[in-house]
């Protein structure tokens, strides 16, 4: 199964709790910046993603240096460099 777990976001933002497996997630983002999320069971295989709110990439360095582990680190660098 899959879920959504936010690992990082803009400074000062309280990240939501990890979602339950195989449950739909609806999020509202009020703070501009980059948010990093993973599928917890599959993150080391590269199942990660980014949400960019308001075209604000000011926290890009924080996000690109986050250590997820496994294949995810390479994928994270690719995703951030595409911004």
Language-model region placement:
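Extracytoplasmic copper-binding redox domains, predominantly the cupredoxin/blue-copper superfamily
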Residues: 1-83
